[in-house]
Amino acid sequence: MAVPKRKTSRMKRGFRRSADAIKAPTYIEDKDSGELRRPHHVDLKTGMYRGRQIFTPKVREEA
């Protein structure tokens, strides 16, 4: 049966458990539109990513 050779220290145990914490998602303010978006994701309102037009957003008709 596999048994640890040394006792795991409190610090090492804490480092391992820190990855289990639930963290709030990160948002950044878009430079062009001023909208909040996730980093490294396309801005859904404008369709831009890193200065390039990825797609043209659909215009929603309000009735």
From Swiss-Prot:
- Say if the entry is tagged with keyword Ribonucleoprotein: yes
Keyword line: Ribonucleoprotein, Ribosomal protein
Tell me the SUPFAM superfamilies matching this sequence.
Zn-binding ribosomal proteins
Residue ranges of region Disordered? 1-22
Indicate the transmembrane segments per the record.
Answer: none
**Can you supply one Gene Ontology CC term for this chain's record?**
large ribosomal subunit
Q: Where is the composition biased (Basic residues)?
A: 1-16
Q: Name one GO biological process term.
A: translation
Molecular-function GO terms, alphabetical: structural constituent of ribosome
Question: One Pfam family from the UniProt entry?
Answer: Ribosomal_L32p
**Top-rank taxon, per record:** Bacteria
HAMAP family, from UniProt?
Ribosomal_bL32
Give the similarity note: Belongs to the bacterial ribosomal protein bL32 family.
What's this protein's name?
Answer: Large ribosomal subunit protein bL32
Organism of this sequence: Beijerinckia indica subsp. indica (strain ATCC 9039 / DSM 1715 / NCIMB 8712)
Gene for this protein?
rpmF
